[in-house]
UniProtKB/Swiss-Prot annotation:
It comes from the Eukaryota. Does not interact with CTNNB1. One of its GO terms (molecular function) is beta-catenin binding. Residues 2-63 form a coiled coil. The keyword Hydrolase does not apply. The keyword Coiled coil applies. Gene3D superfamilies: Beta-catenin-interacting ICAT (1.10.10.490). Belongs to the CTNNBIP1 family. InterPro entries: ICAT_dom (IPR009428), ICAT_sf (IPR036911). Keywords: Coiled coil. GO terms for biological process: response to ionizing radiation. Ubiquitously expressed, with highest levels in kidney. Up-regulated in several cases of gastric cancers. This is Protein LZIC.
Amino acid sequence: MASRGKTETSKLKQNLEEQLDRLMQQLQDLEECREELDTDEYEETKKETLEQLSEFNDSLKKIMSGNMTLVDELSGMQLAIQAAISQAFKTPEVIRLFAKKQPGQLRTRLAEMDRDLMVGKLERDLYTQQKVEILTALRKLGEKLTADDEAFLSANAGAILSQFEKVSTDLGSGDKILALASFEVEKTKK
């Protein structure tokens, strides 16, 4: 009996996830090696990676316009790409966990950050930035936040994350989110 494209859809989804993982790992590696690179080399590599994300975004757009069975499964990837392109999230690891819809790992990362802050291994500014990113990602994944987390998010969410949150909520449909991501890519290129 024919699989009616289920095997192919599964393989395509796996390939897309691997491509997104590779690009997010590339961004994360770039941030980790930032001190070792000169400014021009860093900027050029980051620009190339964002261009690759843009091309990946265009591919997703084409796939979604022709295959509606993938729409729900790809929407998380689209939001992650949109966040990376608009640079709302600065932490590639958070983007990757968000794209893979892994709230448990996001919460584990949050606990590790709390511990690192207490022992002085993580600076307050970086902690605040990453905690806001993780809490925003958890909220977008439909996770319930504690009152303390909501208060922290309200007090510390910047304009960029607020804009990402508003846009992703208002748009809803994959096509509109992809259109916004494409717009952000074009804006970044200029």
